[in-house]
Amino acid sequence: MLNRVVSLLKEHFEIVGSVSDGRALVREAERLQPDVIVLDITMHILTGIEAARELHGAGSKARLVFLTVHQSNAFVRECFAKGGLGYVTKSRMMTDLIPAINEALSNRRFVSPSVTY
C-alpha cells in the first residue's frame, strides 16, 4: 500500500520521506518537518492516532491526512481531535487523497464521502 500511495502522490507533490511504522513516522516528521503527513490509523509500534498525539504534543505544524480502512465516525472524530485535517478511506484513495491533501494545505477539513461524520 505504501508504494501505491507514493506512486500516486509523487506526480503532484514532493515526497520527502516514507515510513512503515508510527515510531519512525514521529522520528522522521521531527527531522524532515513536512507540510503534510499521510498516515494510517493501523500502524505498527504506534498507531496513527498515537503518532498524531505525539506530533501534536511536540508542536508539529504538519497537517495530518489519515488514509484508512476504518469508516467509523468515532475514528474520524478522534483523528480530528488529534489534529487531523483529512480522513480518506482506502477504497476512495485514488479519487480523494489528492483533494484531501490540497484541502489540508489550505487548513480545511476533508472527509471521504463514504464516511458519515
Where are these regions (language model features)?
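Active-site beta3 strand of CheY-like receiver
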Residues: 32-38
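Receiver (REC) domain active-site loop signature in two-component systems and cognate sites
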Residues: 43
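Short amphipathic alpha-helix used as the core "switch/output" element in two-component signaling
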Residues: 49-60
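Two-component/phosphorelay signaling modules centered on CheY-like receiver
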Residues: 1-17
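Acidic catalytic/metal-coordinating carboxylates
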Residues: 21-24, 46-50
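Short, flexible helix-to-coil linker/hinge segments that flank and couple to helix-turn-helix
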Residues: 76-81, 86-117
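Short, conserved "switch-loop" micro-motifs in signal-transduction and mechanochemical regulators
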Residues: 70-71
